[in-house]
Amino acid sequence: MTRFVGLMVLALVAAACSNSTEPQHLRFEARTSVSQSTAITVQTEVTVINDGPTTTQIEVSTCPRAIEGFTTPERTGAPLWRIYGGEVCDAAARIRMLGPGDYYVYHFGTRQIPANLPIGNYYLAVDMGYQLVPAGQFSTF
């Protein structure tokens, strides 16, 4: 029983820290499709891949992740905008185990970019909690 309680406490501590510490050996790749018809909309997905030799855990709750827009390719400083989806956050920690070589894909619904952007290049990123993941770019004319 003591061993089980110890493992449970460890799991809870790891879950509580999952948004503030970067898991080891995880690689993030993002893809975004941009539609520029009447309004600029984006659809983004982020794949997290375990490149390490051991199983690790990631948080996969329903809480929305922000898609952020920057004016520099480095994506540093405060973003011009931050768009959250309409997902309902139930505040329940959901953990998924990723073995070596395993991956998980986060799908984000369609998000509308602010309409009043000046002409220029914009660089997208997704705030994954662990890190800011570059997610493509687009230009306005």
Predicted feature residues:
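Asparagine-centered strand-capping/turn motif at beta-strand->loop junctions
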Residues: 48-53
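Short beta-strand elements
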Residues: 131-141
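Structural beta-strand segments of beta-rich domains
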Residues: 40-44
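Short, hydrophobic beta-strand segments
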Residues: 106-116
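A short tyrosine-centered beta-strand micro-motif
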Residues: 103-104, 118-128
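The feature marks short-to-medium sequence segments in extracytoplasmic or secretory-pathway proteins
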Residues: 58-100
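Bacterial signal peptide processing site
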Residues: 18-20
